[in-house]
Amino acid sequence: MQSFLVAEIQNALRSASVTTGQSIIIEKPTSPKFGDYATNIAFLAAKELKRNPRQLAEELTGHFRFPEGTVTKTEVAGPGFINFFMEPAFIMQSAERVFREGAEYGKGREGQGKTAIVEYVSANPTGPLTIGRGRGGVLGDCIANLAEAQGYHVNREYYFNDAGRQMQILGESVRYRYMELCGRTIDFPDTHYKGGYIGEIAEKIHSEHGEDLLHVESIEPFRSEAESIIFSSIQKTLGRLGIVHDSFFNEHTLYTADLNGISPNQNVIDRLREKGFIGEYDGATWFLTTKLGQEKDKVLIKSSGEPSYRLPDIAYHVTKYARGFDMIINVFGADHIDEYPDVLEALKILGHDTAHVRIAINQFVTTTVNGETVKMSTRKGNADLLDDLIDDVGPDATRLFFIMRSKDSHLNFDVELAKKQSKDNPVFYLQYAHARICSLLRLAWSEIGFDAAKRPEPGVLMRLTTPEELQLAFGILDFGEASRSAFRMLEPQKMVDYMHSIAELFHRFYQECPILKAEPEIAEARLFLAVAVRQVLQNGFRILGISAPESM
């Protein structure tokens, strides 16, 4: 419906010879007395064109040529808002698209014929997944679902950090525990990983090799075994949330030289040097970001010879361009806030267009369990583990709670609320709407022989005229725009909010409008309206990655 209004507004702008660079935004008014939809395009354009906004709004309304039976009236309000009052029969007729399109209803065309890569989770294989990583995983998975809903062919990628100092520390940590099992007394470094899983890996190695590795100086046997076990565990945990990646990019390949003896990391250094953005001082190699107006240069290779995170991240992004993706989406934790702008600047210097690179930063998570906040620390061994949370509240609650607040906001995960079987729990509230519809349709089949799988006759919903029915139909029509908006903002929370509003509208309709006891034609129409809502809920649940129970 919103796309219909946008097209008509664009026609009016052209007809009135008004040229503006402002985007046309359609909103739902706070009160029905202001119409069904509204736009502030006249206000925005007038500011740009230095014109009176109310006069421009009145001029535009004079150029509207809506098809008969679609819009009952338009009115100018306030300083230049244009309100639209829709024809109820048109709303109901439009909502019947759900029956024709089914699971495809609400999908966009923005990404048709295009590819997108969404990188998310990308946790170092140094320990079990924490709750903080879980939030980024669900956020990325939902963003990938939203991209697919807009027509993109999506590649879901995990950047596998299998190189660098942390992997060395992992190997050393396991080796120390192995040596303890061999009877050696070890002063375990405070900088190393102390989780119980380290001891479990050491026990596995000890059971297979005995003391044969005691005098092996290399940590490689310990590192590789730990990496394999931990990464398998990470994939299993993600699978519990329905998160499956299409590809895994190994960081060590960025350190591997090609036939010319140059690694991707070195290639980045060489190309930035050619552009005049590499400096050598204090024993380190620096990205000369002071030339870009920043206060300090950023280290790419430390004095120890170890690359900083920025260098492989730049090289990794170069490979994404080389693979030809039309859109590059990265989902990072809050610890990347200071780093990613430098990566983008380097890519620009290297000649890459960063207009299609999107970044989603998710903030930290704390969990409240019996009124106590649990801290996360993989090295210390008292980690707040994602598996434990899933065990406690289930995968659906875990997913939805991770995205029911803006990614930009710190998330307090209320475990007690996530387990409640009441309307206060947003997961229960959404899924109960679907289960209630399924129960209604089963009852309708047994009592009046209503077949929910049957395609209704065109115009069946036009029999419905009550406010509750119309508001529910309006909600159905907003599904596609909600999905598009959530994708453009990389904000699945917007989709959660929309789904909650649909559930609320349905519950109100269910309470206020008798269904099976209504006149036969009205009963049939209301049942088909419920079928349409069920389809919208299923389509939305698919994006959010939660189940659609038929009974609760």
Curated annotation (Swiss-Prot):
Protein name (record): Arginine--tRNA ligase
Uppermost EC category: ligase
The protein's assembly and partners: Monomer.
InterPro entries: Arg-tRNA-ligase, Arg-tRNA-synth_N, Arg-tRNA-synth_N_sf, ArgRS_core, DALR_anticod-bd, Rossmann-like_a/b/a_fold, tRNAsynth_Ia_anticodon-bd
Places the protein is found: Cytoplasm
Top-level taxonomy: Bacteria, Pseudomonadati, Chlorobiota, Chlorobiia, Chlorobiales
Name of the coding gene: argS
Intervals of motif 'HIGH' region: 123-133
GO BP annotation list: arginyl-tRNA aminoacylation
Keywords: Aminoacyl-tRNA synthetase, ATP-binding, Cytoplasm, Ligase, Nucleotide-binding, Protein biosynthesis
Protein family: Belongs to the class-I aminoacyl-tRNA synthetase family.
